[in-house]
Swiss-Prot record:
Superkingdom: Bacteria
Functional note: Bidirectionally degrades single-stranded DNA into large acid-insoluble oligonucleotides, which are then degraded further into small acid-soluble oligonucleotides.
PANTHER family with a match to the protein in the record: EXODEOXYRIBONUCLEASE 7 SMALL SUBUNIT (PTHR34137:SF1)
Location of the protein in the cell: Cytoplasm
Subunit structure and binding partners: Heterooligomer composed of large and small subunits.
The keyword ATP-binding appears for this protein: no
GO terms, biological process: DNA catabolic process
GO molecular function, one term: exodeoxyribonuclease VII activity
High-level lineage: Bacteria, Pseudomonadati, Pseudomonadota, Alphaproteobacteria, Sphingomonadales
E.C. number: 3.1.11.6
Protein name: Exodeoxyribonuclease 7 small subunit
Gene Ontology CC, one term: exodeoxyribonuclease VII complex
UniProt keyword ATP-binding present: no
Length: 83
């Protein structure tokens, strides 16, 4: 599979693209069993990474548009350390 980038260093878009490639490779049926198992594990980790990035983005958006009562409060700076 070549060099495998660390998940933490991948943007959502990079992780999604890699996940699509993993799925394509698995669906082709051409990978040997051991490689298929490695691909599946990598794909599962990529899926979890993408979900975490989406969850973090959703939390930031909700913090921006709602106050503690759930009413629109305008824009507030979001925490740059999230995600």
């Amino acid at each position: 599979m070549g060099t495998v980038p660390e998940l933490a260093s991948l943007s959502f878009e990079e992780a999604l693209k890699e996940l699509e490639n993993v799925v394509r490779r698995l669906e082709s049926g051409e990978a040997p069993l051991d490689e298929s198992i490695e691909l599946y594990a990598r794909g599962d980790a990529l899926r979890a990474h993408c979900q975490a990035r989406l969850d973090a983005a959703q939390a930031r958006i909700e913090a921006i548009v709602a106050d503690r009562d759930g009413k629109a409060q305008g824009l507030r700076p979001f925490d740059e350390t999230v995600g």
